[in-house]
Amino acid sequence: PLLNILVWLLPLMLVWTLLRTRLFKGWFGERLVRLRAHFRLDRQVYRRLHDVTLITPDGTTQIDHVFVSPFGIFVLETKHMKGWIFGGEKQAQWTQLIYKKRFAFQNPNRQNYKHLKALQAALGIGPDFVHSVIVFVGPGTFKTRMPANVTRGGGWVHYIKSFQQTVFSEAQVTAMLQTLQAGRLAPTLATRREH
């Protein structure tokens, strides 16, 4: 009887431990964004690339999600966080508060800035057409007013759809996608590890 219990209990404990890791939570958050994009953004209008690693002058940069559309290019950074989130547009560091414990983390807009610059360089386009979008998934709660591009849950879809002015032709969108596909490193586990 004890052996039978252990046969079930040990795998359950292993799965429970895996589900609580930062790696799994990050992976899961990115999958939630993909799922929401699948159902809420027309694939013909908002063409997507996920897990894009580009070579930069100082190494590489990994971008969670890129949506290329006639209305601009949207660069998504996914954050899976719990607790209370405090931060401002101009602050270098934001704060996560969990049960009276404070954790500082880099302003995600600053983190995404490198991604924006890498895409601009790869595509030879100006900053007016590339938009930073920060997506917080998980049970975190904003406790300060956030910039419009910093969203929770599905708010990022509304933010992207708020851009209505056409800035790229279909031919330009296709050409940019081809350029990114050709210039990115293969989306493999080895690439992620090296980055």
Residue map of PLM features:
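Surface-exposed interaction regions that form or flank ligand-binding interfaces
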Residues: 1-61, 68-73, 82-84, 93, ...
